[in-house]
């Protein structure tokens, strides 16, 4: 389909007895950011390697920009860029020299490679540092330069495999801004990440992957709705009163975080739940430091969908 940049039907990949991809299905619309979330070992990096033709699938129909990744691997490579988890830069060279080198490796002529390097340095706000060696760059600057290198050939589809791992908040924000500008220019981005905030900030749609399969897909708001919509959080003054509060509050599905003296539960009628909780606590003489309504976070969605909630326990 003309409006679909990536099509995956029934992708399978084995490593010995382990299925890294187990019948995975995926659709990514052209000109969007599609986030792929999942715990370690879920199959995210294997998926990126298959889509970028670095790894041959065992089964399935997989197309990128209308080309089959097995039968038309070369055509796929001409249309994609890849930013892996580890930087592919020469620290002894300057930023401009690195980009020129990537250009020559992609068979650009010397003049075109220099021009493209200058374009990308300007685009990623690195023009003033182009002569500095990469060793002198901050983490965020290195990652932006690495991202620029992946765009030397002006790809239709860009794969970002955990692009901000190890960066501080400032560095992550710099990369996020760069990704937003790419999509504004029409590039399709497939983003794998372990930062839930990153997917919430960048992704138009999100696929949650576990055990080699997509177990949920939608916008961030759609996925958050799957955990029960709105939630109410109650922070008590005394942790010792958590059990009593759970027993008397007019709520179901309550979770308890003892360290934070926090009770949390899904609600359907926001105002009725809020007034009911405040009234019940007052009548029982239980002091609350804070009572608030909120939407569920993407972290809670992730833990709920993957069954990996180790931080909170269902109240008995």
Swiss-Prot record:
ATP binds at residues 38-45. Its EC number is 7.6.2.2. Disruption phenotype: Deletion of the drrA3-drrB3 operon decreases by 79% the daunorubicin (DNR) titer in cell culture. The drrA2-drrB2 mutant is more sensitive to DNR. Deletion of the drrA1-drrB1, drrA2-drrB2 and drrA3-drrB3 operons almost blocks DNR production in cell culture, suggesting that disruption of these operons impairs the efflux of DNR, resulting in intracellular accumulation. It is found in: Cell membrane. PROSITE patterns: ABC_TRANSPORTER_1, ABC_TRANSPORTER_2. One of its GO terms (cellular component) is plasma membrane. Pfam families: ABC_tran (PF00005), DrrA1-3_C (PF13732). Induction: Exhibits high expression level. This is Daunorubicin resistance ATP-binding protein DrrA3. The lineage of its organism: Bacteria, Bacillati, Actinomycetota, Actinomycetes, Kitasatosporales. The gene is drrA3.
């Amino acid at each position: 389909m003309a409006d679909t940049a990536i099509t995956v039907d029934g992708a399978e990949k084995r490593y010995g007895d382990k299925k890294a991809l187990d019948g995975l299905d995926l659709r990514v619309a052209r000109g969007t950011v599609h986030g792929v979330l999942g715990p370690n070992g879920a199959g995210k990096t294997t998926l990126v390697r298959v889509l970028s033709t670095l790894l041959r699938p065992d089964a399935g129909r997989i197309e990128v920009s209308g080309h089959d990744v097995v039968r038309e691997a070369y055509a796929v490579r001409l249309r994609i860029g890849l930013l892996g988890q580890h930087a592919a830069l020469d620290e002894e060279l300057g930023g401009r020299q690195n980009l020129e080198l990537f250009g020559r490796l992609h068979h650009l002529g010397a003049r075109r490679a220099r021009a493209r390097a200058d374009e990308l340095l300007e685009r990623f706000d690195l023009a003033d540092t182009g002569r500095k060696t990469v060793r002198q760059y901050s983490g965020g600057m290195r990652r932006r330069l690495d991202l620029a290198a992946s765009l030397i050939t002006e790809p239709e589809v860009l794969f970002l495999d955990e692009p901000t791992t190890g960066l501080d908040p400032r560095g992550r924000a710099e990369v996020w801004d760069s990704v937003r500008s790419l999509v504004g220019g029409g590039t399709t981005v497939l983003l794998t990440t372990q930062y839930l905030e990153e997917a919430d900030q960048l992704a138009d749609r999100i696929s949650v992957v576990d055990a080699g399969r997509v177990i949920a897909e939608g916008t961030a708001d759609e996925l958050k709705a799957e955990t029960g919509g709105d939630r109410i959080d109650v922070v008590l003054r005394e942790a010792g009163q958590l059990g009593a509060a759970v027993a008397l509050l007019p709520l179901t599905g309550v979770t308890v975080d003892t360290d934070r003296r926090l009770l949390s539960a899904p609600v359907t009628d926001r105002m009725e739940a809020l007034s009911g909780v405040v009234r019940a606590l007052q009548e029982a003489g239980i002091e609350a430091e804070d009572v608030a309504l909120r939407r569920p976070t993407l972290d809670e969605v992730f833990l709920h969908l993957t069954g990996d909630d180790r931080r909170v326990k269902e109240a008995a």
